[in-house]
């Protein structure tokens, strides 16, 4: 178990930031002096002045060397954006980074290791917006992650290049780096927008030697070295990311957050506790899963900035690094072992053990061999002893039979002297037949010499055997080690031929040695493995011990039975021996007497009696012998069964050994076959390599020969007669190629003319758009004039209303003056006149209100039409942009066609000159297009100025709809023109395909004449290289133009944004002015209220005058006072309730009618009393009525003015909202246009790359064809 190595590297600071930095570094710890809790310790901390080599040598160098030995390794840089991660990993030409240093160090260690052969593969991928892209094969995008038992976690479809030098690796890396996503932010000009993983797969095995092919091991070590450059975490507030950059930053932060959670879980030991670690939440953590708590050596380089602005980001980076310190990995060597490799490895280990035994333990091995030989000898002796015992038993049985035969002969001799009956003879014959059996322990004495000696020998031997066996059999069975050292028992030292002597002279061997007996049939022990021999000895020893236990138990049982029988026979034998001795003495006496006197009848009787006794004894003896024979037979059968089992076991062992030998031989044969196959494959590869080298040398020779042939052809042009047909064919080919060239030139001229026509059409369309813009500007000016006219008319109307208001006020004053002079009879007429005047004023007010409403509606309509006109102008702009894009597409297609024509015309110098002319024309076209673009930009500025002018207008736009319809028709025409352009483009693409087919035909014809035009083909290759460089230059120029076009669009969008901001500011100012107007209107309302109060004071004064005038009639004065008081209250109420003007108007009219009715009543009452007084009071009454009417008109006017101002404010607010909506739409459209431009740029770049790849393939095909042609020559 080894933990992750974590080092910290600080980015260099400016002098100002270094003074204000809150972080302090001391040795391998970093802390904030003001915060005691913010202190971190790491394996290494590198200050601002350190070099990348120091960072590499801290831990990465060891990881690289371990990767060569078969350990997985991972190194990745972590930190916020603009902290120096890419500089640490990639470096620069002056100061190389970790990846170049690791690559060079890797190849250096491989070159130093001469005992192994290596195969290196590299891959380079990026994780962009959670999509895996192959940087070595840009067409491979959105790859998937898979997992299996053999490969583990891997990316399916990822391209892996076999590399053989560090220069090749770095070149491939540069190629992949050119396809990496890099963007610009406020914090970094070249900010990495994706995570990249540079992976080296290292395979190695031991070198195959000619002498020791069988000794080599096929175990393959496979290790993976990952060098990861992570994208930095960022904050949108600091980087200013928007749109695509914001999306990229969110994906980067999400993946880094998942990495942080995985590190946190592993540092807390969640995985060891059976918890869940979210490796699958991000593709980055899924790919790096083996490096995070798995089978790998891992190092983290944490890049930080000590500036005070980025204190929070530095703190989070250091917390991540401190958590990573607690994560442990378990790295081990990754080897792929086959069965053959395992067998070879075991053989190698066995051979190493043997060599060790021979070298270091030679004495000990000799002793072990001697012990093994002794055990084998002992086992063979034991075996021979068993065989001798069997043979001796056979000899003993044969000897017993021989003794019985001799006894039978003696009995026959005796029976010849005595006449016996047939019954006795039969008995004797039966006795002789039965007496042939083995006589083991008890043999009767039939004669003095032979039988007594035999019996004494047998008894002495039996007693010695019994004594020896009793000592060994009374106790338990002894182990083999004691049996070997058991004392010997000499049963009969004098008898050298006896069986027991041979048995006792043999030493009991070690039973484990029975299997390993060195006999002629068995192979020598030196040819076997000592480990295998020991295992077989242990197994056979166990089997032999089991068989020996079984044999001993059976033998003990049989011997116990024999002992019992011997006891019985001993008891019977004493009496039988005595009787035998007596019978023998008597027989001898009788024999001697029989010689003397043969005719003595008493002697005959005695002989008969003795004969009967002998027969009885013989019967008993035969029965006992039968029992003994049965027991012996059972014991022998058991011994035979045991021996058969032992033989079967030995046969099984022998068969198992043979099977093992056969299996070993098969394994050896298979190993040899596998080795032969591998050797054949390797030899085939070597042969292929040598053949390739030979072919290359032959190709060079053919090149040299072609050059010599060309020189010879140049010299042989003098022999025109011999080479005339070749020259004729060559001239025909040149003519055909010139004709094809002319056709190509014509097609190019047609394409060029079509492009010129398209350019002219675009210029015409541009002129039309300019005319439309001029017309729109004139319309806008007319609308401005009309708006000014409407404003003047509105001013006139307002002045007219004010004059009418003043007239009405004067009229009311006149009426108030006339009230005092009116009589009671004329009050009714005046009342009617007042009503009529009031109604007229009402109608006039209604007319003015309707006019104002109509004007406001017209204004809203004009603003809506204005907004629609602006939208249509935007559409025109977008269509113009689309036309410009089409022009750029046509330019790109023209460039592609130029490239194809360049490839086709590279064979002849004349075509090159024409192509240069075409390039000049194309350059002129590009200049014209650039001028057109500048003009379009100028027109855009003019249009933007016109839009700014239009934003401030609030006048009517009546005729704009018709003109917009006309512009729509024109737009439809433009769309039709665009479709025509598309069809032309399709036709041009078909022409291009035809050109490509023609090129293919030309190539085929060139292949046929390659034998005769080798020099020209070589020149063509050189020219192709030149034109490929030109193509690259053209593509770079196109890319620069596209970038410039993008920058121009961005500048225009920024201008539009600034203008829209200005419009917003103007709208805000208008809102402020409207608020000021509202305040002014409120102040006017207050002033009106104050004037109404003044008028109420005047009414009070007039009431006092009426009181003085009505002194004559108290009733009339009281009525007038009450009426005046009511009018005062009503006026004050009307001033307070200014918001509810209509209700107050109704209330005032009703009150006025009541007053008029009261005035009529008063006039009737006063007509009878005093007309003169009424006439005097008429003037103040009229003044009052006039003042009331004037107040009513003022109230109506104030209400109308307030309503108008409210309506104006509402309309202005609506206009502002519409403008804001239009601005937001413009912003969205600009964003969409920028995204479309980016997509199209990506598609165009992808197409260019595909075409470049196809051209490269064509070049390779041409080279192959050249090589094939050279081989055929």
Swiss-Prot record:
Domain Kinesin motor: 3-327
GO MF, one example: microtubule motor activity
Entries under InterPro entries matching the protein: Kinesin-like_fam, Kinesin_motor_CS, Kinesin_motor_dom, Kinesin_motor_dom_sf, P-loop_NTPase
Keywords: ATP-binding, Coiled coil, Microtubule, Motor protein, Nucleotide-binding
Coiled-coil intervals: 333-408, 602-674, 751-1023
GO biological process, one term: microtubule-based movement
Region entry Disordered, spans: 452-474
Matching Pfam families: Kinesin
GO CC annotation, single: microtubule
Domain of life: Eukaryota
Comp. bias regions, Polar residues: 453-467
Family the UniProt entry places it in: Belongs to the TRAFAC class myosin-kinesin ATPase superfamily. Kinesin family. KIN-7 subfamily.
Protein name according to UniProt: Kinesin-like protein KIN-7O
Organism listed in the record: Arabidopsis thaliana (Mouse-ear cress)
């Amino acid at each position: 178990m080894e933990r992750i190595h974590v080092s910290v590297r600080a980015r260099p600071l400016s002098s100002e930031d270094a003074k204000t930095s809150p972080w302090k570094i001391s040795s391998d710890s970093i802390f904030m002096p003001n915060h005691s809790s913010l202190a971190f310790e790491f394996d290494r901390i590198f200050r601002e002045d350190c070099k990348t080599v120091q960072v590499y040598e801290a831990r990465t160098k060891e990881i690289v060397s371990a990767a060569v030995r078969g350990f997985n390794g991972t190194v990745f840089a972590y930190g916020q954006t603009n902290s120096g991660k890419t500089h640490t990993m990639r470096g620069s030409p002056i100061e190389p980074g970790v990846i170049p240093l690791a690559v060079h160090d890797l190849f250096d260690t491989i070159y130093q290791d001469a005992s192994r052969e290596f195969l290196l593969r590299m891959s380079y991928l990026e994780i962009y917006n959670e999509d895996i892209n192959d940087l070595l094969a840009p067409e491979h995008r959105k790859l998937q992650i898979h997992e299996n038992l053999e490969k583990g976690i891997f990316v399916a479809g990822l391209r892996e290049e076999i590399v053989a030098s560090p220069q090749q690796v770095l070149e491939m890396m540069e190629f992949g780096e050119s396809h990496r996503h890099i963007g610009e932010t406020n914090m970094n000009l070249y900010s990495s927008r994706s995570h990249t993983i540079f992976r080296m797969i290292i395979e190695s095995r031991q070198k195959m030697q000619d002498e020791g092919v069988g000794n080599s091991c096929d175990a393959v070590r496979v290790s993976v070295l990952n060098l990861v450059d992570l994208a930095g975490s960022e904050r949108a507030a600091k980087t200013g990311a928007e749109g695509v950059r914001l999306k990229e930053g969110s994906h980067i932060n999400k993946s880094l957050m998942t990495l942080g959670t995985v590190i946190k879980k592993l540092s807390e030991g969640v995985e060891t506790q059976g918890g869940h670690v979210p490796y699958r939440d991000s593709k980055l953590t899924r790919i790096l899963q083996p490096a995070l708590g798995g089978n790998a050596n891992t190092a983290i380089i944490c890049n930080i900035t000590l500036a005070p602005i980025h204190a929070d980001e530095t703190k989070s980076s250091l917390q991540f690094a401190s958590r990573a310190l607690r994560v442990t990995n378990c790295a081990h060597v990754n080897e792929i072992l086959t069965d053959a490799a395992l067998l070879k490895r075991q053989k190698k280990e066995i051979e190493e053990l043997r060599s060790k035994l021979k070298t270091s333990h030679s004495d000990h091995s000799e002793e072990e061999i001697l012990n093994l030989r002794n055990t084998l000898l002992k086992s063979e002796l034991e075996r021979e002893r068993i065989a001798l015992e069997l043979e001796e038993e056979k000899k003993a049985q044969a000897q017993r039979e021989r003794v019985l035969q001799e006894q039978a002969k003696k009995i026959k001799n005796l029976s010849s002297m005595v006449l016996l009956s047939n019954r006795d003879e039969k008995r004797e014959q039966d006795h002789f037949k039965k007496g042939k059996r083995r006589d083991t322990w008890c043999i009767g004495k039939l004669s003095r010499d032979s039988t007594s000696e035999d019996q004494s020998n047998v008894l002495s031997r039996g007693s010695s055997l019994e004594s020896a066996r009793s000592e060994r059999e009374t106790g338990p069975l002894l182990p083999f080690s004691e049996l070997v050292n058991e004392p010997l028992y000499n049963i009969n030292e004098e008898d050298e031929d006896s069986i027991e002597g041979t048995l006792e002279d043999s030493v009991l061997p070690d039973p484990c040695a029975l299997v390993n007996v060195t006999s002629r049939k068995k192979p020598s022990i030196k040819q076997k493995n000592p480990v295998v021999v020991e295992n077989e000895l242990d197994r056979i020893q166990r089997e032999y011990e089991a068989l020996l236990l079984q044999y001993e138990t059976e033998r003990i049982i049989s011997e116990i039975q024999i002992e019992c029988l011997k006891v019985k026979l001993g008891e019977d034998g004493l009496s039988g021996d005595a009787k035998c001795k007596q019978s023998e003495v008597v027989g001898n006496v009788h024999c001697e007497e029989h010689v003397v006197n043969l005719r003595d009848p008493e002697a005959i009787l005695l002989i008969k009696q003795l004969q009967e006794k002998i027969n009885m004894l013989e019967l008993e003896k035969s029965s006992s012998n039968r029992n003994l024979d049965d027991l012996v037979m059972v014991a022998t059968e058991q011994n035979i069964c045991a021996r058969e089992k032992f033989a079967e076991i030995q046969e099984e062992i022998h068969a198992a050994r043979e099977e093992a030998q056969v299996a070993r031989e098969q394994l050896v044969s298979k190993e040899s076959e596998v080795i032969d196959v591998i050797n054949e494959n390797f030899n085939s590869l070597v042969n292929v390599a040598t053949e390739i080298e030979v072919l290359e040398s032959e190709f060079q020779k053919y090149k040299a020969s072609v050059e010599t042939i060309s020189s010879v052809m140049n010299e042989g042009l003098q022999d025109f007669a011999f080479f005339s047909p070749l020259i004729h064919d060559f001239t025909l080919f040149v003519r055909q190629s010139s004709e094809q060239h002319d056709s190509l030139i014509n097609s190019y001229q047609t394409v060029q003319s079509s492009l010129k026509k398209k350019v002219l059409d675009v210029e015409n369309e541009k002129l039309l758009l300019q005319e439309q813009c001029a017309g729109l500007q004139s319309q806008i000016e007319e609308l401005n004039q009309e708006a000014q006219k409407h404003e003047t008319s509105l001013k006139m109307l307002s002045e007219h209303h004010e004059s009418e208001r003043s007239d009405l006020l004067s009229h009311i004053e006149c009426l108030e003056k006339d009230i005092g002079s009116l009589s009671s009879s004329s009050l009714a007429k005046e009342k009617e006149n007042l009503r009529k005047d009031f109604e007229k004023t009402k109608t006039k007010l209604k007319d003015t209100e309707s006019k104002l409403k109509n004007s406001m509606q017209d204004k809203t309509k004009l603003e809506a039409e204005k907004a629609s006109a602006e939208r249509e102008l935007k559409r025109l702009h977008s269509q113009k942009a689309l036309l410009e894009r089409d022009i750029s597409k046509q330019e790109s297609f023209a460039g592609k066609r130029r490239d194809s024509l360049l490839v086709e015309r590279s064979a002849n110098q004349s075509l090159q000159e024409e192509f240069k002319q075409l390039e000049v024309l194309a350059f002129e076209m590009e200049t014209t297009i650039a001028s057109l673009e500048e003009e379009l930009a100028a027109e855009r500025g003019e249009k933007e100025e016109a839009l700014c002018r239009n934003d401030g207008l609030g006048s009517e736009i009546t005729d704009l709809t018709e003109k917009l319809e006309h512009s729509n028709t024109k737009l439809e025409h433009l769309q039709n023109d665009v479709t025509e352009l598309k069809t032309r483009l399709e036709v041009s693409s078909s022409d291009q395909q035809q050109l490509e087919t023609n090129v293919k035909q030309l190539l085929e014809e060139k292949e046929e004449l390659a034998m005769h035009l080798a020099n020209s083909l070589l020149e063509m290759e050189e020219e192709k290289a030149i034109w490929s460089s030109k193509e690259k230059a053209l593509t770079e120029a196109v890319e620069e133009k596209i970038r410039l076009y993008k920058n121009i669009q961005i500048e225009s969008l920024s201008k539009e944004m600034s203008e829209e901001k200005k419009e917003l500011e103007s709208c805000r100012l208008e809102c402020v002015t409207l608020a000021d107007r509202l305040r002014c209107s409120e102040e006017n309302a207050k002033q009106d209220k104050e004037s109404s109060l003044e008028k109420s004071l005047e009414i009070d004064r007039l009431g006092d005058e009426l009181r003085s005038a009505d002194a004559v009639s108290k009733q009339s004065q009281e009525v007038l006072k009450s009426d005046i008081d009511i009018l005062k209250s009503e006026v004050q109420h009307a001033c307070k309730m200014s918001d509810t003007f209509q209700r107050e108007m109704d209330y005032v009219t009703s009150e006025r009618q009541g007053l008029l009715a009261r005035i009529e009543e008063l006039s009737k009452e006063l007509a009878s009393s005093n007309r003169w007084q009424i006439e005097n009071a008429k003037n103040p009454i009229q003044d009052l009525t006039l003042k009331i009417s004037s107040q009513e008109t003022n109230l109506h006017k104030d209400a109308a003015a307030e309503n108008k101002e409210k309506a104006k404010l509402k309309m202005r607010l609506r206009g502002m909202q519409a403008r804001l909506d239009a601005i937001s739409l413009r912003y969205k459209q600009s964003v969409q246009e920028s995204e479309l431009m980016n997509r199209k740029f990506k598609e165009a770049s992808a197409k260019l790359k595909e075409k470049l790849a196809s051209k490269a393939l064509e070049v390779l095909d041409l080279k192959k064809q050249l090589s094939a042609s050279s081989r055929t020559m």
